[in-house]
Swiss-Prot record:
An MF annotation (GO) of this entry: rRNA binding
SUPFAM superfamilies per UniProt: Ribosomal protein L20
GO biological process, one term: translation
Keywords: Ribonucleoprotein, Ribosomal protein, RNA-binding, rRNA-binding
Entry's Gene Ontology cellular component terms: ribonucleoprotein complex; ribosome
The organism of origin for this protein: Rhizobium rhizogenes (strain K84 / ATCC BAA-868) (Agrobacterium radiobacter)
Keyword RNA-binding: yes
Protein's recorded name: Large ribosomal subunit protein bL20
């Protein structure tokens, strides 16, 4: 059986790591030992931050919705409560976009939310509200 030297595979692995480390500062971009550690760490940060990114965007959407709803005399929590009681299921991303670009439609949602809150405060049951709306 022929002798197998592993220079080709290790060189390919090193090239792969160094390619991923392009753009790094200092020895991290061209020394395999530091580049490998930096690439591993960068992948951990990327994995973590993909989740953090979702949290940050949800918080941004909520802030935008809250600001737009307060112009109509409601708070964010009351608005969402009213939408839930009215049976309107719109996610926060769409609500945020509507608040910025489609203010009339967003105003209609705020009115529906207020109506649901007022009606349920007076009547008390959700079924009566749905019967009155439909």
């Amino acid at each position: 059986m022929a002798r197998v030297k592993r220079g080709v595979t290790s060189h390919a692995k090193h090239k792969k790591v160094l390619k991923q480390a392009r753009g790094f500062y200092g020895r991290r971009k061209n020394t395999i030992r530091t580049a490998k550690a930096a690439v591993d760490r960068s992948k951990q940060y990327a994995y973590r931050d993909r989740k953090v990114n979702k949290r940050n965007f949800r918080a941004l959407w909520i802030q935008r919705i809250n600001a737009a709803v307060r112009e109509h005399g409601l708070t964010y929590g009351r608005f969402i409560d009213g939408l839930t009681k009215a049976g309107i299921e719109v996610d926060r991303k769409v609500l945020s976009d509507m608040a910025i670009h489609e203010t009339e439609a967003f105003g209609a949602l705020v009115a529906a939310s207020k109506k649901a809150l007022e009606y349920l405060k007076d009547a008390g049951t959700k079924n009566e509200f749905e019967a009155a709306v439909n």
